[in-house]
Amino acid sequence: MNLQYSGEQHIPAGLDRVWTFVTDPEQVGRCFPNVVDVSVQDPTHFDAVVQVGVGPVRGKFKLKVELQPDTAKRRLDMKISGGGFGSAVDMTAGADVVDAGAGATTLKWNGQAIARGPIAAVGGRVLDAQAQKLIAEAFATVRERLSA
C-alpha cells in the first residue's frame, strides 16, 4: 500500500536552532511517536524501536533511519526502513526548514511510505488515518521541544 503526506509546522524558534535540532539523530529519534529506544550509530544514522498499533495489528517496529541534510538548501531528507510482526515499511520524508521571520521557522514537509504485510491489510483508511496522526504527533513534539 502506497501512502503520501505533506504539511507544515510553524515553530516559534529561530532557523539555526531548528536546523541544529532536526539534523541531530538523537533529537529526531526522540520525536518519533511511541518511541521505546533510540540508538545513534553516527551523525546521520540511528536505529529506533517504536510501539505500533493499527487496528488489530500491534507490536514493536525496529526502524533504521538515515538523515540526509543539505545545509545549503536547508533541507533535510530521511530514509526510514524496518518492520516487525510480519509487516514492513519503507519511507522517505523531507522537510524544508524555512525562516518565517520574527524568530520563527516553518517546516514544510512531505513524505511517502510503502507498507507491506498485516499492517497494510488493515485497510487504507485506517492505516492512512493512523499514519497522519503519527506524523502530526512527531512534528508537534518537535515544536514542543523547541518551544521549551
Language model feature labels by segment:
Residues P25-R30, G55-G59, G84-A88:
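Short, solvent-exposed secondary-structure boundary motifs
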Residues P118-A148:
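A conserved amphipathic terminal alpha-helix motif
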Residues N2-E8, H45-D47, K60-K62, R75, ...:
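Intrinsic-disorder/low-complexity, polar/charged segments enriched in Ser/Thr/Lys/Arg/Asp/Glu/Gln
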Residues S39-S81, E137:
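Glycine-rich portal/gate segments that line the openings of hydrophobic small-molecule binding cavities
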Residues G7-Q9, V35, K62-P69, I80, ...:
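Hydrophobic/aromatic beta-strand elements that line small-molecule binding cavities or substrate pockets
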Residues M1-G53, A148:
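Hydrophobic ligand-binding cavity/cleft-lining segments
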Residues K79-A129:
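Beta-strand/loop substructures that line and gate deep hydrophobic ligand-binding cavities in soluble
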